[in-house]
UniProtKB/Swiss-Prot annotation:
Residues 541-562 have a biased composition (Low complexity). The chain crosses the membrane at residues 200-220, 246-266, 279-299, 349-369, 377-397, 404-424. Residues 425-600 are cytoplasmic. Its EC number is 2.7.8.-. This is Ceramide phosphoethanolamine synthase. The modification Phosphoserine is found at S525. Residues 58-129 form the SAM domain. Belongs to the sphingomyelin synthase family. It comes from Drosophila melanogaster.
Amino acid sequence: MCDGEIGDPVTQPRSEGGGLVTMDQETRTHYLDAATDKHLTNGSPDPEPVDPLLVAQWSIENVTSWATCMEHFSRTLLDCLRQEAIDGEVLLSLTEEDVRDMRYKLGYKLTFGELKKFWIAVLKLQLLVKNSSAESVILGIECHGNGNSVYMPLASTGCGPPSSSTCPCPQAECPSYVSDCDTYLRMGGRYVPPEYFKTAMSLGYSFVVTWITSLTMVIVHERVPDMKRYPPLPDIFLDNVPHIPWAFNMCEITGSLLFTIWVVVLTFHKYRLVLLRRFFALAGTVFLLRCVTMLITSLSVPGTHLQCSQKDFAIDDPNVDMVGALIIRMSRAYRIWSGLGMSIQGVRTCGDYMFSGHTVALTLLNFFITEYTPRNLYFLHTLTWLLNMFGIFFILAAHEHYSIDVFVAFYITSRLFLYYHTLANNRALMQSDSKRTRVWFPMFSYFESSVDGMVPNEYDTLGSLIDGIIEQIFKAKDQLAISVKRCWLDAPLSGNSSAHMFGGESEQCLRNGTASAAFFSPHQSLIGGLGGQRSQTHLNSAQSGSSTPTPATSAPTKSLPTQKKTFRDASVDPFSRTTFAAVQQAENVKDSPMKEKKHL
């Protein structure tokens, strides 16, 4: 229905000539005293009729009077209308969310029932004006048919009376900053900016975490328990499944296939930067947690086929100092980092058991592919889940991890993914207590601050993708040219540079003992702002009267360093005290010939 969650639609009588339209008695809500049968607000049982042609021209007092006559509203609500400057035009463009914000964002102490009654009154007034012949009034009236807030101008629409099943409200026009108008309208007026800087920040965060993980794997390999003293722990799955030598390589091939699918999804998805930002943030967080669990507890080697020993990575050379040991560990960490920790890349590590990094990678790729592909791609979703499960099975069949390692990795990764996207897709959960969200989830609050709701799964064609790449290249070139021009041609002059530019000329004038107009010419615009054309005349007069002898009492004399400092300060700061002193001195110099003549 057309009026959303408020109630049944209300159809008002329409005037052919745009005259007065009086609301029906059934649609009017009164608060009557049983004893006196009078209206509790103004003592009149019938409010004045409303002219829909004049509602948009109401002043703040007219709106307050209308609210007083319509319902028994509290003084707090009336004060809110006055303080927030709600006039007729603003009243007609109010939405249910705006009315709700009076209590939850603006902080007015209004009851829930009063807010609902005020919104019902506003909605009735909006429908009354919309159904009248006031076609020359541009209004922002909300269509509540599909749950999306779509605002449209009434003059160009002529949206008819609301019905119980349909709401013939037209679509709004896109703002100028939206490049994809169809996506903007399908998202209900929401726009998802790419935010390159935030994506770069998430990439940097993930990059740092991968280096920390590699260094942690080097350290835990040095602390791996001795296989002779600490045999493999009892495990239900490992004790009943024989060792398959090629299984771990198959697990990594499975992960590579999932990664290839994810790269294809990223390439053609319209909001690829949002997906990248979320992937890097979640992957970095999970692997950072894995560094803690690997380091605090060292489990014994899960299989006897693994050749793991502390001597392989131990640094026992007494000639190696702390810096040398750090360099050796960093070189080993680089080998792990460059090989992505994969055995098919020649990387062999021990001790990094709790929890499984391969399971984390498989689960993250599976969940991201499933989330950001259309729901009707059942074959793709089934394939990714099969690859995920078979990858986990291959890890256990290779006896490279305990069962608890795989289970904890799958649980933590899946829960973190679901919690993150639950908060991101439901904006109200994050905005209900924004301060606490920023404290407990600072990275989430930063990365998702401009994303409102679910990201639609929309894809670019190959042609549009190429056009977008070319457009981004030209846009980057234009931005670079503008930045170079701004830095090279439009660089503002600092105080030191201006003093350096005009300092030589001022020193020349001071050595000549005259305050010539040429000295002041670079600063006429500065001093002219203080005295206009008058100050320029004074300076020129000072030049013409410089040859006339001036009595000692006509103008105060200053030493050469004082004058030099005064003019330097005037060039740097035209509003300093020394600038006014220089102007006053010039006026005294101008008046000195008249005083001398009078003295003679």
